[in-house]
Every structure is written in C-alpha cells, then in structure tokens.
Amino acid sequence: MIFQVDNNDVFASDSGQGIDKNKETIILLHGSGLSHIVWSLTEQYLSNQNYNVLAIDLPGHGNSEGNCLKSIEEISDWLEKVFKQLSISELTMIGHSQGCLESLEYSSRYSKRVKNLIFVGGSYRMPVNQDLIDLAVSGDDKAVQLMMKWSYENSKKFIGGNPVEKIINSSRDIREVLATDLIACNNYENGSEALKSINCPTLFIFGELDKMVNLEK
C-alpha cells in the first residue's frame, strides 16, 4: 500500500489485503535502521488471523520517501498523520526496539486511538552505547554487525538458523538511517512520563539473551 503524507510517498505492507473497516487493525513498527521487511512473517501470520495488518516504513526507510525523522516525538506526530490519512480510528500497536518508544510516545499523545500496546524487545528508556552511535555515524559496517550479535546471535539455537539477518540484508542499506535512529532512541527522555498515561492493555515481550535491552531496568 502506498499513500501520501506531507507530499511524500509512504509505504505500508498489508499482505495485499488493504483495510477492511469490519476488521481490527494492527500496526507494526520496525526498529532502528530497518523496514517493514523484518515483520514479514509476523505480518503474514496476523493477516491470516483476520486482522488488518500494516507494517509501516518510516520516512527514509524501506520504500517510504522523505528524510529520516530525528526524534521519537516527531515520529509519533507523523504516525498520527498516517492514521488520519488512512481513516483508522482504533488500533493495536506492536513496536520492536525503537518502535516501542514510538508506540509509547504515540499512545501518550493520542490515547483515544490506541486499543492495545505490545512492546517487543524495548523499554521506556533505551540509551544507546556511544561507541555504537559513533560507528553508525561513520557508516562503519561494524555497527550493524554488533546489533546483530547483541540481538540475534543465539537465535540459531532455537529456530535452526537466523532468517532475521537475511531479511535485514535484503533491505535498503540501513547505514543511511541507522545513526539518526540510534540518536533518536538515545535522546528520548519522556518515557517514564508517557508510561503514566497508558490506560490500555499492554504486553511486554523480552528476549533473555537480548543485549540491546537492559532487563534490570
């Protein structure tokens, strides 16, 4: 699905189903530097469960036009424009990593639209290692390699291989936007206040071996 926001094309993968007003809608928000592609398997599964499912590419990511947005707050306001454009009045948001921060901030600003929240591998505060930011800013491939190591290194023990790496490598070169995304995560400080405004069912999903999230906090 392609539509326009702020005179730029926005892409949302919908499994070719479009939006059925008689179905509940689930929004999938990708993590730093990524795109709708990382949600491919999840999107297909949820679509088969009779939901509207939209895996949205943020500006400058995947197939969406425009410049990469520089703050979580800016992204949340952009998402509101998306949902208005698509006439979505109620939704469930599923965010991964940076997408958790976006879902959290969005729900604190536009709570009337949000029916459920699901946070996958994320928290209300996600400080980023400065060395990782520096590598991303310089365009060093090691930034991506470290993210893969810290997030998915042990996945082969459970799923017989790591399809996520192949999915990521099939996306637009994430080095173009990774630094901006990581800095946005690192600079986001409204999480604790935003949490107080949540008034809908909320699920947190964490990976015990995921080193990108501090489970102690």
Label the predicted regions:
Residues H30-S32, L91, G95-S97, G207:
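Conserved alpha/beta-hydrolase "nucleophile elbow" surrounding the catalytic nucleophile
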Residues D57, T92, K115-I118:
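Residue in the alpha/beta-hydrolase core beta-strand immediately N-terminal to the catalytic nucleophile
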Residues L101-Q145:
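Flexible "cap/lid" loop of the alpha/beta hydrolase fold
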Residues E73-L91:
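Conserved acidic catalytic loop of the alpha/beta-hydrolase fold
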Residues D134-N199:
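Conserved alpha/beta-hydrolase catalytic His-Asp/Glu region
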